[in-house]
A protein has these predicted regions:
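Short, conserved micro-motifs composed of acidic
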Residues: 1-23
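RNase H catalytic domain
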Residues: 1-5, 195-222
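Flexible loop/turn segments at secondary-structure boundaries
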Residues: 2-5, 79, 86-89, 149-152, ...
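Beta-strand elements of modular eukaryotic interaction domains
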Residues: 19, 130-134, 142-144, 207-208, ...
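C-terminal reverse transcriptase regions that engage the nucleic-acid substrate
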Residues: 22-135, 140, 155
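Alpha-helix capping and helix-loop boundary segments enriched in small/acidic/polar residues
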Residues: 53, 57, 100, 179-187, ...
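A short, polar/acidic, helix/strand-boundary loop motif
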Residues: 62, 159-191
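Acidic, metal-ligating active-site segments
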Residues: 139, 143-168
Length: 222
């Protein structure tokens, strides 16, 4: 598949299509910050971290803070899955909803809250071809899936080739916490394979089948 070269003019979608003024600090929507000038998206979770300062560290408040994170594409999956694992551990220890957390769990929750502030250092390009200045010769989807005793994940990358080399960008991911009832690694990886297959189908349909599925890697067991 061949695509037309991207325009060399430094004009962002915000300026050319939406008529938004440049030079501002960007637009913040649902915890995401859109930089008009650079045409990048950054998860802004500092407000949630500050909110946590006024809340006691309890089992109830962990999912309460997690619910404030808007990440439909799973771009910060490692951050959200950590909170889910900690909440599951609190359930495993049969901690009451309003009882204060202590020990290792409390320290882990506090470390997770601090990591929310660091998410502002993560930036994603809104446009997949943002820095491409030559003709795209081929593009494809590459999927990866794996599982552990605590969680499992599927992730899809968009890979495209030009005359100067190959480039890849993460498109989306799905993360899940392993069930409280312990399952074997092979069974968890089979579940992960199903998630990857569904996610790949969704992404391909969203792109109107303009790309091919070149590679799907699963865990070593499956």
């Amino acid at each position: 598949m061949k695509l037309d070269p991207v325009s060399t003019e430094n004009v962002t979608y915000a300026k050319s299509s939406l008529g938004l003024k440049m030079g501002s600090n960007g637009q913040k929507v649902l915890g995401l910050s859109w930089d008009f000038e650079q045409d990048t998206i950054t998860p802004e979770l500092t407000a949630i971290a500050k909110r946590a300062e006024d809340l006691p560290a309890t089992k109830r408040n962990t999912p309460r803070l997690l619910a404030g994170i808007f990440d439909p594409l799973g771009m910060i999956g490692p951050t959200t899955i950590t909170a889910k694992i900690l909440f599951q551990e609190a359930c495993r220890q049969k901690i009451n909803w309003n009882d204060p957390l202590d020990g290792v769990i409390k320290q882990a929750v506090e470390a997770w809250i601090e990591s929310l502030i660091e998410c502002k250092l993560i930036t994603f390009d809104r446009c997949l071809y943002k820095h491409v200045r030559e003709e795209v010769l081929e593009c494809s989807l590459h999927g990866f899936a794996d599982a552990s005793k605590k969680a499992y994940c599927a992730v899809i990358y968009f890979v495209y080739q030009t005359s100067t080399g190959s480039y890849s960008k993460m498109l989306t991911s799905k993360t899940r916490v392993a069930p409280l009832k312990e399952l074997s690694i092979p069974r968890l990886e089979l579940i992960t394979c199903l998630i990857l297959a569904k996610l790949m189908s969704t992404v391909k349909n969203a792109l109107n089948s303009q790309v091919s599925v070149r590679k799907q890697n699963f865990g070593q067991t499956v």
